[in-house]
């Protein structure tokens, strides 16, 4: 808690709320700390602190990178190969493929109704080739820019 005694007249100051509490009693402090505005102020305080920490980390990383203390990513400046992931079985030509419904060894097919129709084709995941500008490469980290609230 950020309660500081201000004077001997039994008033306490809450740094989060920038306000004085009327009495030096646990019940007054508890009531104040359970209040909606106090909770919002505490949340805002720590949110702002986290944004400052993230910005400090970004600034330190940028300075270290410019000073040559950090090497570029292993994926940077490497061409992306033309290898493709094979399409799912549902997109291959021919009749739909199903896994055989077989139980434990030597038992034959399992009884019961056959499952319904195969699901529709899955959407393509994009074409192979170089990534567009401003796209992150694997291994890159992302720290969003802090939003300054006035």
Curated annotation (Swiss-Prot):
<comment type="subunit">
    <text>U1 snRNP is composed of the 7 core Sm proteins B/B', D1, D2, D3, E, F and G that assemble in a heptameric protein ring on the Sm site of the small nuclear RNA to form the core snRNP, and at least 3 U1 snRNP-specific proteins U1-70K, U1-A and U1-C. U1-C interacts with U1 snRNA and the 5' splice-site region of the pre-mRNA.</text>
</comment>
<dbReference type="GO" id="GO:0008270">
    <property type="term" value="F:zinc ion binding"/>
</dbReference>
<dbReference type="InterPro" id="IPR013085">
    <property type="entry name" value="U1-CZ_Znf_C2H2"/>
</dbReference>
<keyword id="KW-0862">Zinc</keyword>
<dbReference type="GO" id="GO:0030619">
    <property type="term" value="F:U1 snRNA binding"/>
</dbReference>
<dbReference type="GO" id="GO:0005685">
    <property type="term" value="C:U1 snRNP"/>
</dbReference>
<dbReference type="GO" id="GO:0000243">
    <property type="term" value="C:commitment complex"/>
</dbReference>
<dbReference type="GO" id="GO:0030627">
    <property type="term" value="F:pre-mRNA 5'-splice site binding"/>
</dbReference>
<comment type="function">
    <text>Component of the spliceosomal U1 snRNP, which is essential for recognition of the pre-mRNA 5' splice-site and the subsequent assembly of the spliceosome. U1-C is directly involved in initial 5' splice-site recognition for both constitutive and regulated alternative splicing. The interaction with the 5' splice-site seems to precede base-pairing between the pre-mRNA and the U1 snRNA. Stimulates commitment or early (E) complex formation by stabilizing the base pairing of the 5' end of the U1 snRNA and the 5' splice-site region.</text>
</comment>
<keyword id="KW-0694">RNA-binding</keyword>
<keyword id="KW-0479">Metal-binding</keyword>
<dbReference type="GO" id="GO:0000395">
    <property type="term" value="P:mRNA 5'-splice site recognition"/>
</dbReference>
<dbReference type="GO" id="GO:0000387">
    <property type="term" value="P:spliceosomal snRNP assembly"/>
</dbReference>
<dbReference type="InterPro" id="IPR000690">
    <property type="entry name" value="Matrin/U1-C_Znf_C2H2"/>
</dbReference>
<dbReference type="InterPro" id="IPR017340">
    <property type="entry name" value="U1_snRNP-C"/>
</dbReference>
<dbReference type="InterPro" id="IPR003604">
    <property type="entry name" value="Matrin/U1-like-C_Znf_C2H2"/>
</dbReference>
<keyword id="KW-0687">Ribonucleoprotein</keyword>
<dbReference type="GO" id="GO:0003729">
    <property type="term" value="F:mRNA binding"/>
</dbReference>
<dbReference type="GO" id="GO:0071004">
    <property type="term" value="C:U2-type prespliceosome"/>
</dbReference>
<dbReference type="Pfam" id="PF06220">
    <property type="entry name" value="zf-U1"/>
</dbReference>
<dbReference type="InterPro" id="IPR036236">
    <property type="entry name" value="Znf_C2H2_sf"/>
</dbReference>
<keyword id="KW-0539">Nucleus</keyword>
<keyword id="KW-0863">Zinc-finger</keyword>
<comment type="similarity">
    <text>Belongs to the U1 small nuclear ribonucleoprotein C family.</text>
</comment>
<feature type="zinc finger region" description="Matrin-type">
    <location>
        <begin position="12"/>
        <end position="44"/>
    </location>
</feature>
<protein>
    <recommendedName>
        <fullName>U1 small nuclear ribonucleoprotein C</fullName>
    </recommendedName>
</protein>
